[in-house]
Amino acid sequence: MNILFCSAGRRVELLKDFRKSMDDGDRIVAADLSELAPALYVADAHYLVPRIDDPSYLDTILSICRKEKIDAVTTLIDPEIALLAQNRERFEQIGVEVLAPYAETAELCFDKFKMSQFLAAHGIPTPDTWGDYASAMAAVAAGELAFPVFVKPRTGSGSVGARKVHDADTVSYTHLR
């Protein structure tokens, strides 16, 4: 099996551990936008690629898949999951399995508010969650929510932007920009 790890970054140990489970003749190919990404250099082959939001990115990845006879592709960063999921058919047309959730599931997982609603609808307890500033402030006015609160962007990963805030002005300043 030949597998392509997109956005390989610093995941050297992950690639090394993955290699331990592979058979002789199997290959790891890594791609990243930075030549400084250490995981590139533990792969059997590596490629420098554009940013995932570059219009040529997907065609670049598909080209690598064809050239390296890739059997499966996955990503090591959250924002790219949706891109692979939404383009699953293009990969399947060239015989490449996408190791990522389907597009609907990827969208659900990347949107914290939608995930909270989904979990609540299925009886899975979650912290109280508001999807926007206005509804959160209405909950404060109704006495359903009190400061301090924990806020984080509705989408994103790596806890970027997650923080404890003590007042409405901070919530507004932090999350309405």
PLM feature spans:
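ATP-binding N-terminal substructure of ATP-dependent carboxylate-amine bond-forming enzymes
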Residues: 1-100
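Short acidic-hydrophobic, aromatic-tinged amphipathic segments that line or gate anion-handling sites
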Residues: 47-50, 130-132, 165
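Pocket-edge positions in alpha/beta enzyme catalytic cores
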Residues: 49-53, 107, 163
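Active-site donor-binding loop signature of nucleotide-sugar glycosyltransferases
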Residues: 51, 153, 167
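A conserved helix-loop-beta module that forms one wall/lid of the active-site cleft
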Residues: 93-161
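Short amphipathic alpha-helices within nucleic acid-binding modules
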Residues: 171
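Conserved small/polar residues in nucleotide/adenosyl-binding loops
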Residues: 174-175
